[in-house]
Amino acid sequence: MKKIAIKIGVLSAVFVLTIILTALLMNSENTDNMGDLDAATLPVVMAEIDGNLVNPMFGYRQQMQVDFSREGLTPIDTIRKVKIAVKPFDQKIQSLSYEIRTSDGREILENQIIKKLTKSDGYLKAILELKSEKMRMNQEYSLKIQLDLESGPVYYYTRVIQRSGLNTSRYVEFVQGFYQKCLNKDTASDLADYIEPDNSASSSNFTNVTIHSTLDCITWGALEPQMVRTGVPVIREINETTGSITLSYQISAKNTDGGTELYEVNDFYRMRYTQERVMLLDFQRSAQQVFDPTLSVANAQGLNLGVVSKELEYITNPSADIVAFVQTGDLWSYSQSASKATKIFSFRRDKNSDERDDNQQHNMKILQVDESGDMDFVVYGYMNRGPHEGYVGVAVYHYSSTQNAIEERVFVPSTLSYEFLERDLQKLIYVSENNQMFLLTGGKLYQIDIEEQSYQTIQDYIEQDCFVVSSDNSHAAWTKEMDPYGSTEVTEIDFEQARTRTLKADSGQYIRLLGYMNEDLVYGFASQKNVQVDSNGKVTFPMKTVKIENFDGTVKKQYQKEDLYITQANLSETLLEMQLSEKRGNTYVYKTTENIMNNKKAVEESVTQNTVYTERRGMVVRLDFKQTVSNPDPVVLTAKVKAMENANILDMGVEPSDEEAYYVYAKGILDSVYSSPAAAVNRADAMTGVVLNRRQQYVWERGNKKTKIKLNQKEIPDAVLDAPLSVKELQENLGDFASVLDLTGCTLDSVLYEVSMQRPVVAAIEGGKSLVIVGYDAYNTLVYNPEDGKTSYMGMQDSTEAFEKAGNIFISYIENMK
């Protein structure tokens, strides 16, 4: 018996040991392939102007489309030398070369290899001497700098422009002095001379500080911040009159417990230089606090996120116990019951972080969070570090809460810059339960099979005005003809089911998309003969019927009113507002407004977003839970990254549409895109911005109009001097020489910019006649009359009134790049 007992004991011990070893081996297998994102490796390149470093350029591993990569603007003088400084970050640079292209990227004007780099203050410096005789004044060009590293080539992009009378150094030095002075109230008193405080700006919101904020708010109130990382100015726009610069930097502040808070700050400055000093025309600052759960962020009410924009993306699991949110480029998950905060994804490193890690040209979208805390999400934009460092694209990830690890499922690279990619993805990105991803990019709608690593194009060309998406991105619809007021057929898609349906207008009618109410499509019908376009280009689309219909074809609501037409419809999440008009002859006269309310019952949210005023930080954002938060100090975890066994890269080779578009840039960012140059000019005027066309030529600039000019009529094409009021006719007569700009609906003051840029403007006057504006001064316009061939002055006020009476019909052109 004793031997049997010993034998049983030995076998039991062996069994237990086997279980332990097996568990250890399995755990090793589960953790050996997990780690962190690899550190950033690529150098940073900057331009140098009069000893000041400007326009930091981050490296790309693939060549970008220069007409969709609008980086900083580097002014050059008549000598046409560009000084650059390379911050190598221990990388060995084997060679440096550069290439000058036209702004649309179609023609290479020059390429050279730089044989000599000099070392200075930790930088490698070089001088690029641009020699191409094809470069013209006042025209942007793309400069691509190529560094050859041991790991392969890396590309850097900036824009260059040759203009006279610029005050670049004065603007740069003003910005550097202004933001530094803001950190020290003792030296900030003279800043009061530059700002314009009034009641339009909040004095307690550090996420939205403007030129109209108080001096106390501009100098950070009671926050008492310290500089962590200084900023390098980025020149966005500059001309003989004004300059616009953005600046990104980091500050820190001590909380009441002595903990250190970190803030990402973005400044925008628009300036004009007079003979005496720099004048500040506009100033905006946004500070965003980096979330740090070690700073006692949880209290009885909820989770204090600190100084952050109210446009915060967050989503909960079904029971609302777990909330996921994106803050300053970091993705976090907070579990109330487990009192646990997990950093799911971040390019920012906890220690030894530098400007490459904190590059803000990326964003995230949370797709879903399940009950256990597992999460699907998308990271899109420039990849600061990791396996796709230096690439722009869309990465789909899955987070496992049990393993506390993320796994990349697919990466779709793009040659569009972050701001263009974001514009598309903000409109639509959706991943179904069947692992089908639908996204809008480059003006096309794609379906990607994540498991099969394959894709197909659902719709080859999409006009923004003809494409609508439901609030949860699960449905979308577009018109067949891609004409918002001239389409007869609509296609709607259910992304979860990957099914489409078609809606057709009856013969003699047009169909118009209005949007979505919940997941129901809202659209209307109008008789083709009733659709009108006035002299200002404004379209009247009088609908007799408006329908609200789900994907299965069930009409939830059909609205029509006898003898009245719906001439305008405004749709929000909760309300469809319709303006009803009566037809009198060929015009429609407004009668009344009627509304259709969203009858979907509001779901009571268990997690809500609120703002709270604090003495030191001003307005802060808090996520409030329905249940009281019991533990103020959550456990803090950081998710690991699963190593990829195979490269999950799906290169779709997206080529943007060649259709003409007009881009409005304002306050340092891409503000909007229009198909109409007139609409773009009006928007840029309101936003104090600029307009560029598809080829990145300046169509219009706010504040860069000469005080007077007189064009040489001998240099004006005869097709323009004939003063046709038909855009089509003028384009046919100009041929490939130029592209016509229909500026109907703009003000006279706006279109005089075209004259200032040596582009005459055809203007309508009463009686169906027209004139050509060939010059102006402070008091008059100079107009050419095609009927008698004479040129005469016309008072500015008389000109304004005459053109307004004729409907402000203006037509100009811009020479095509050769």
Regions found by a protein language model. Name each.
Residues A39-E99, D104-I108, E140-L223, V297-K340, ...:
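Core segments of small alpha/beta cavity-forming domains
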Residues Q464, R501-L513, T554-S572:
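Conserved blade-ending motifs and adjacent loop-strand segments that build the rim/top face
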Residues V14, I20-T31, D67-K83, S95-Y123, ...:
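Surface-exposed, charged secondary-structure patches
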Residues M1-V16:
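N-terminal Sec-pathway targeting helices
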